[in-house]
Amino acid sequence: MKLSGGVEWALHCCVVLTTATEPVPAARLALLHDVSPSYLAKQMQALSRAGLVASVQGKTGGYALTRPAAEITVLDVVQAVDGAGPAFVCTEIRQRGPLGTPPQECTKPCGVARVMYAADSAWRASLRSVTIADLVDSVEQDNGPTALPAIGAWLNPAGSGS
């Protein structure tokens, strides 16, 4: 399974948006993470299309989470950025070639497909079981209780409007 880099960026943005008191422009999120503003903007647009963040227009505009962090799963973010399609798509290779199995004998998925479908299901269940709130907790455990408040203050400096 290979996820795009945008998934990592989007997850980090969702975590830090939990600290913001006002909408945060994508450019400010990109500056915080030292990443490409245009590429990050695409990830934020994907989150917005999925309804995970709201895009607020105007001088004090930016992005904000649309619901509590405990209600947004890692799977929600992965699917918003990389799509909801399956990780494995069976192409029935067993039916090809000079010794291929006749299609009428292929009435159920083969062992390869079954194990891949099971792995995809387990992977999705694992990502579904972790929320942005859980990731916030992990940041606090890994970096201490002042890390996220400091980020929140940097994202929304008092009186700046952004």
Outline where the language-model segments fall.
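N-terminal helix-turn-helix DNA-binding core of bacterial DNA-binding proteins
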Residues: 3-7, 11-35, 54
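C-terminal regulatory/oligomerization modules of transcriptional regulators
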Residues: 90-162
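Beta-hairpin "wing" of winged helix-turn-helix
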Residues: 51-66
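Alpha-helical residues within the helix-turn-helix
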Residues: 31, 48-49
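Key DNA-contact positions within bacterial/archaeal DNA-binding proteins
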Residues: 38
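Short, hydrophobic-biased segments on the C-terminal half of alpha helices
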Residues: 14, 44-45
